[in-house]
Every structure is written in structure tokens, then in C-alpha cells.
């Protein structure tokens, strides 16, 4: 991504909610990181549990794979703002609770707020 004569690092927000299929999130994070893309990560409590249960991925390992991990309860985090520069957001897996919240404009935590902002800013949101 080029802006005003300098190269800006590519950023993507990866969200994980509590649905089965955490291996997809794990693999996506690996591919993005290996491609030099800055990964900003947020997960619901259940999402973190599923990542650990299905993939054996601990917070220590996750911290080494992504640029930054955000607390799902901190609605004041950078990714909750439209001024946070990123290309897109992916929520994988996406639980029915998260999908229903997004479909009805309910942004009750950082995961759904970041997705809501992604849509508001006209960026791509992949579920």
C-alpha cells in the first residue's frame, strides 16, 4: 500500500469467535504473517478457548505470530476507530452469535465493534 511517496505496511484485522473451525484462523494468521502482512488480532473468550482446544495454540504462541493482540472487552482500542488504517477484516470462524450481532448492528464488544467500523468505512469484511 503506497501513500504520499512512502510504503505503508499492509494491515489486516483477524477476529475469532467461538465457532468450530479454529484451524482456519490459525492457518490464515500463518499465511498473512509469512506474507509480511501486519496482523491485528481480537478474539472472543470462546474463540480463544476453541483456538487452544482445536489447535493447541497458546497465548504465548499467538503473541509470537501476530503484531498485536487486543482485549475483546476494550472497546476503546485502536481497531475500534475508523481512523485505524487497515485494508480489511476477517472473522474466522464466525459464530452465529457474532453473525447475528453484526446483522443487527449490535457492537457489544471489540470484535463486533471493529467489524462494524470495517463496514462503516467501506472496507472488506470476510466472515
Regions found by a protein language model. Give the residues of each.
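A cross-family phosphate/adenosyl-ligand binding-site feature
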Residues: 2-126
